[in-house]
Amino acid sequence: MRKPYKVRDRGRAVFLLDREEFERWFRTAKKSLESAEGDAERGDYNWACFKSHQAAELSVKALLHGLGLHAYGHSVARLLREASNRGLSVPGELVDCARELDKLYIPTRYPNAWAEGAPFEYYTADDAAKAISASKRILEWVEDTWRSLEGELRRGGE
């Protein structure tokens, strides 16, 4: 069984760090982002957009699960709000990225999200590039935040 570690986040909150759980989820997020990039290269832009959303969702869930918190749902913006409610500093621009990605969760996959045609007919290389960029920003923030919390632990957090 994994042993979580306690850390103080600049005196505001106490978190339990579960590195193994964080890594399990974060590796999955990174693999999803790699898959999105491959889809974009092949011209499967709707799937690149969807997987960009998935990568961002999985990365924020990695952070929350790594902190011993519950992480439910698929809205990246809501998951970031949960992180913020728990004392983490979430930049507003990151929430904007999350909102853009949240718009891609359903219509990238389901024909009935559109009046006619199929999802793949509606997405472009530019859409995919923007989604991948937004997802990368969220993954970078998650990784930086995790490293900061681990640094607190190394510096003597409880």
Feature names for model-found ranges:
Residues M1-E158:
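Terminal alpha-helical segments
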